[in-house]
Amino acid sequence: MSLTRLLIRDFRNIETADLALSPGFNFLVGANGSGKTSVLEAIYTLGHGRAFRSLQIGRVIRHEQEAFVLHGRLQGEERETAIGLTKDKQGDSKVRIDGTDGHKVAELAHLMPMQLITPEGFTLLNGGPKYRRAFLDWGCFHNEPGFFTAWSNLKRLLKQRNAALRQVTRYEQLRPWDKELIPLAEQISTWRAEYSAGIAADMADTCKQFLPEFTLTFSFQRGWEKETEYAEVLERNFERDRQLTYTAHGPHKADLRIRADGAPVEDTLSRGQLKLLMCALRLAQGEFLTRESGRRCLYLIDDFASELDDERRGLLASRLKATQSQVFVSAISAEHVIDMSDENSKMFTVEKGKITD
């Protein structure tokens, strides 16, 4: 699936844009603040319902406008799909697919699997466990049809359980929530464990190519003790949870621990090496999706040249080309991306929110 056309209205500093896109590489070149990252963010938002630079909707809608509008056309092997997203200052969204309203953002996410690589993306490696849970959950979402519903129900039940912890005095009063929570937690943890095991070889192979000087290991931690039933953990920790007023163990505490030569990667790798590792993990995830389902990711890469020397940029470019996926790359100068260009690529110039090709 590739995005063949993108229409943007009143998004960030872009008043209006209508872009015909390449199914291969698309380059966005312009000075800092020109709006090139806003194009990437518009694509991301079309597939996620939210921006990646700000959760405040008022900062995403163009100044003095009431809403932004995004439309796209997705070309699959057999058919074309029209998609659209409108979001106003109150945060209300309208999703349209093939001319009909009433769709969910999750449907857009399923139609547009994408990998985002930005200068802020180091949080996957040096941020808290929630960023690595999100990495695993992306894979589970695209590989397990029941994951999104189970994950949504888990979040709801945990919120209700945490509220109940402020009021109950005996564990028996929590059993109605735990009766629903326990099977969901175990299923989600099983999916995450299976996904992390399935993608392990892809991550190891890609990391070996990108960072041959290190031995990288990946370890899934489910969020409670090994070989202990979740029901037992919840009951045993009731008094502690009640004092904390939240559930201290469970899939919401899971992590994917990543080590280089036995030490945490954030303590061992340079910024350039961390970026390579981040790219390697995103590539591995996209390649795993293609192998398992035949679907390809869109890759969004902001500030391609930062942290990478010429050799490493060349390595990343060659691996991206090998995926045969659609790729969007922003750069300050065309010199940073010209070597990646071929007869099927498109080069866009961005200046003060105006986009030309």
UniProtKB/Swiss-Prot annotation:
UniProt key word Cytoplasm: yes
Main location group: cytoplasm
BP terms from Gene Ontology: DNA replication; DNA synthesis involved in DNA repair; double-strand break repair; SOS response
Classification via InterPro entries: DNA-binding_RecF (IPR001238), DNA-binding_RecF_CS (IPR018078), P-loop_NTPase (IPR027417), RecF/RecN/SMC_N (IPR003395), RecF_2 (IPR042174)
UniProt-annotated binding residues for ATP: 30-37
Gene3D superfamilies the record matches: P-loop containing nucleotide triphosphate hydrolases, RecF/RecN/SMC, N-terminal domain
Keyword DNA repair: yes
Keywords: ATP-binding, Cytoplasm, DNA damage, DNA repair, DNA replication, DNA-binding, Nucleotide-binding, SOS response
GO terms of molecular function: ATP binding; single-stranded DNA binding
Subcellular location: Cytoplasm
GO cellular component terms, A-Z: cytoplasm
Described function: The RecF protein is involved in DNA metabolism; it is required for DNA replication and normal SOS inducibility. RecF binds preferentially to single-stranded, linear DNA. It also seems to bind ATP.
Family to which the UniProt record says this protein belongs: Belongs to the RecF family.
Protein name, UniProt field: DNA replication and repair protein RecF
Organism field: Escherichia coli O7:K1 (strain IAI39 / ExPEC)
GN (gene name): recF
